[in-house]
């Protein structure tokens, strides 16, 4: 069996497994609550790994190792920020959010929770938050599909557009059939595969590295002291603003609907405690090993870097090249190498399917049912959700059609937009009973608009504020949104007594 055939077989087994899970979960999905929230029946391990797998995307196995490979360990600050954000999200947000969404009329989605939390009879919060989700997640889904297309193209030489279609079709099939349960179950498998790949590949590759490591780094064309220092970005000292901006990525977690929905869907408090431990351990190990892959790759792939062998690695393909070099050239186990490359595909798919489902729920449950047709039956909402899944996937496919499109550059803006719009509002909704509807609307709009202005409007000497200052828009957007929520809530009418009573009920329920 040729190397390419062996890797193709590994991909085929993996993709068929994902579709099989979708078929199995379809039999368990009977209504909208099952399709969008899994009937609030997620176990701890499934909730933990599905949340983390859907969060990290291909960035964990391509973007982070690639940036460390190119510029050194100073790129690890973003991993530190994401690790701290994950820990805070599970320990501070998860339990209260699950409790409040149950008390607030068993809310199935984040926009629905906001509407129920503030008794928004005019559906203003619901409409604004749903539109924000659809816009940002459409771009997110497109970027994930594009990553999958590029992966197939890199590994097999398949035409990008054919590869894009294959990846999109598989994700659409199991998401369409099984909904949230299929997404979480496949994400559990994918999260496990990602962790195994991260554990095995760098350890095996390290066994083939010989010689003084610092000398190998120097031969590869970098200053070894700068490369291994957290205080350098390449050969340039890292600035405080760069550190703050990278750490600030962690702020986004409390505003990510595709992660927060896992908290809402966990079966009970016991499973929540279990999932918190699993998720935190997973993210610490995974981020650490992803950084290690970039560093080890610099020495391990030295012959290719120096041109002594064919195929000098590009930054983002360092993990792929490490797998191929180890399991094809060194120990001749191409099928196993193919399974580990599937770990990269798993990272991409686990994010795309979650984003697809969040868009679907925003349109069918939050916009169609809650705003336009409150009398819609459960079956009707389920059918609209499935149709929306197809439409959103098709739109994302169109956006991702150009392999050289700038959609990937928009991912950080989407993270900032969602984190700034939803993050402060989630926190204040859970922990400050004085927050009212005007404050919530002000926070939602100010957070999203600040990110757009900061990243796209040339206000400072013909430059955008981001270009002029280098400060990540999430930092500014989060702070401004938080201030708007507090100030507007204090200068407008206090929440109705029924809202305050519901808040007290939630507090009591949370402590049970």
Regions found by a protein language model. Give the residues of each.
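Membrane-embedded helix-loop-helix hairpins and adjacent transmembrane boundary segments
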Residues: 1-512
